[in-house]
Swiss-Prot record:
Name of the encoding gene: NEFM
Record-given protein name: Neurofilament medium polypeptide
Location in or out of the cell: Cytoplasm, Cytoskeleton; Cell projection, Axon
Its biological purpose: Neurofilaments usually contain three intermediate filament proteins: NEFL, NEFM, and NEFH which are involved in the maintenance of neuronal caliber. May additionally cooperate with the neuronal intermediate filament proteins PRPH and INA to form neuronal filamentous networks.
Species, as recorded: Oryctolagus cuniculus
GO biological process per UniProt: axon development; intermediate filament bundle assembly
Key words, A-Z: Cell projection, Coiled coil, Cytoplasm, Cytoskeleton, Glycoprotein, Intermediate filament, Phosphoprotein
GO molecular function, one term: structural constituent of postsynaptic intermediate filament cytoskeleton
Biased composition (Acidic residues): 274-292, 308-328, 351-368
GO cellular component, one term: axon
Region annotation (Coil 2A) ranges: 51-72
Entry comment on modification after translation: There are a number of repeats of the tripeptide K-S-P, NFM is phosphorylated on a number of the serines in this motif. It is thought that phosphorylation of NFM results in the formation of interfilament cross bridges that are important in the maintenance of axonal caliber.
Amino acid sequence: VKVELDKKVQSLQDEVAFLRTNHEEEVADLLAQIQASHITVERKDYLKTDISSALKEIRSQLECHSDQNMHQAEEWFKCRYAKLTEAAEQNKEAIRSAKEEIAEYRRQLQSKSIELESVAWHKESLERHVSDIEERHNHDLSSYQDTIQQLENELRGTKWEMARHLREYQDLLNVKMALDIEIAAYRKLLEGEETRFSTFSGSITGPLYTHRQPSVTISSKIQKTKVEAPKLKVQHKFVEEIIEETKVEDEKSEMEDALTAIAEELAVSVKEEEKEEEAEGKEEEQEAEEEVAAAKKSPVKATTPEIKEEEGEKEEEGQEEEEEEEDEGVKSDQAEEGGSEKEGSSKNEGEQEEGETEAEGEVEEAEAKEEKKTEEKSEEVAAKEEPVTEAKVGKPEKAKSPVPKSPVEEVKPKAEATAGKGEQKEEEEKVEEEKKKAAKESPKEEKVEKKEEKPKDVPKKKAESPVKEEAAEEAATITKPTKVGLEKETKEGEKPLQQEKEKEKAGEEGGSEEEGSDQGSKRAKKEDIAVNGEGEGKEEEEPETKEKGSGREEEKGVVTNGLDLSPADEKKGGDRSEEKVVVTKKVEKITTEGGDGATKYITKSVTAQKVEEHEETFEEKLVSTKKVEKVTSHAIVKEVTQSD
């Protein structure tokens, strides 16, 4: 290795030496060249003039080029500057217009900002006002709600008070009805005492003229009073509805509308019946005139034409009995509906039958007295024809007297009749005593009267089953009371006995079916019979009716509850003494169950009673239509017609 390295070192050293020699040679060459160049320069110095001229030419050429370039640059600059100045002027105008627009926009912005501030202020004020209004509204609403609650409480209390008053009013009506019945009984008793006293005093002090003339007038009126007492027709309707609802005021208005509609229907039906009965009344009036003429010719034989007509009237009686059976069938159906109500009045039925039995005996005695008196006075009437004519003129004027249109006004004819009644007490009592004596002397004639009563009573019932036929017939009787008196006294005197017999038959057939609804009418009749005792009440009532005329006839139509059916009925009631009208108008009872007052019961009772003579039948229908949301109604309708 060392050898090799030595060899390398040796070779390298040789190479370095070679390179050094080459380098030195090159340097020498270069130095030689430099030296040679200096020599050339020096040679060139002789040509310096030529170079300067060349340089001058070049310099002149370059200056020409530079001048040209300078001139071109200036021209270009000027053109460019002119263009820029023109553009600047145009931009200035645009800038000016832009500045003006900017100023305008600034002014608008300022005005809008001011307006916005005002609107914002107004908005705030409105919001404050709205908040105030809402607060006030809430306050008012709360106050109104409190007021409504208070008014509802007051209304509820008022309704309770109204219900209490209605109950009290119903109780007072019941008491009033009982008092009216009792007053009527006492009135009959007083009238009987007055007539008996007048008859007694007339027989002592008065001459023949004083007691003969009243006897004729009595005979003209007996037919009305005799028929009136034993003949009662009752139609009783009771409607009880329990209605559960929340709107009581709507129901009241509906009930009032229904009642007004019913009243209108009744008025229309009454007018139609009145027209029909006027035509029939004219025919009956003509027949009555014929009978009067026959009575003048043969007053003693007044009963003979009745005996001849007996056979034809018996057939009519059979038909009437069939009609009564049909009515009893209807009564039985109605009695089943109101059975619970009818059981309570069974005692009154038995008492009434006893009263009717007593009434029959009294009527027989009265009829015997009247028949005997009629025969005794028949000859005297012919002699006293002139005073009788005066009585005729006086009585039609009474019949034409204005009829009161309300039950309050009916008291006036009663007072007038009582005044006239006091003047002739003595004469009437004298006539009654003579009748009693005549009844004892003629028992045979009483038997004949009983036979004639049956056929005579049947056509009367047919004529009077429409209420208005009897009005026309009675109007004719009132117009000519003195003429009809002689013959009618015998005929009408026979009617009460037959009618009371029929009442007993009807009472036995009706049985327990008629007990409840006929309670009021039986009490009235029983009191009349019990008070008058020996049947004098009916006999004493006849002369009183004679003196009072049509004014007294209207008094017979007793309107218990202060309500009449219609003006048409009132006018006809003034012309006839055979009708008694008892009408109880609607009575509403409002009760509230529970403290909240949500459930309310209204009890409406409508009671209509028609008390008529001559077996009259007057049917009054009540139609009540209810249209209410959520209505529960229970209705009990009881309609009973009794043939007394």
